[in-house]
């Protein structure tokens, strides 16, 4: 996958900017707070996903404006010897709540705009920013989101199944919730409804967990090999999926814990309570990993995510690396730069001196104004 060009209007602190990336490496330099990450974030939105920094869509729009607009030309990879793929044009609008069309909408090649989530899978990308260090030290929810976000890009049906699971889970929790302000359903009726919801949860949960397990068979070996290179073999990384049930066992688990859930007033089991355990020398990284080890673990996962996506889809995702090189020693930096070869990669940096001799493109961002160096 390649981004051929990008035009940004009224996006965060960027009034107007045009980017014409290099075929492989594109570097965006500038001091902190100038808008480098904003530009990477704009590229990421072309995946159809939400901002990797969190927050509401309205926060993406430049202060005083109703809309932000992103226009991009993209091109899919083709096997060597084949005719190049036709470029696709994406136009995305991000509207504030006061705008005529609030939220994120995208149109491809002039078609009618759809919700931006419909872009899932059409522009594969992998992003790393310092906030992703929470993958190691943070709550299990962040590690589940990491898996689910990757799978939503790779398999169009995964997003639909995941949304169904979440919707049924919300209905189940609403049914289970105790409230002093509303009349409770008769116990027998509540139990019957719970069995219906559990049947649907089991069907969706089994399918989602199977995809997660299959994906990890590709991701885990690559991530662990990457870590061995980054750490020079100092520690051994391993990954374990902490499942609540074995394949085919979710329906039984839900039946076994039904009475307990009725008493607790909430759902107590399912794929939304599973975790991805990251280990260094068989010890939990969330407890023992240093800051440098955390960074190496997350980088290993992200590079493995890109490699797994390339194997599954047949094309390399675009890499978006925010402030990733600043804290790496020369050996780790060179390994990472080697991994970037033959992949379109966007890197932000506060220091442009080490990139001025690159074969790629170098831009500088100052106060939301982008200029080629």
Regions found by a protein language model. Name each.
Residues 72, 344-351:
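Structural recognition of the conserved hydrophobic beta-strand(s) that form the central parallel beta-sheet
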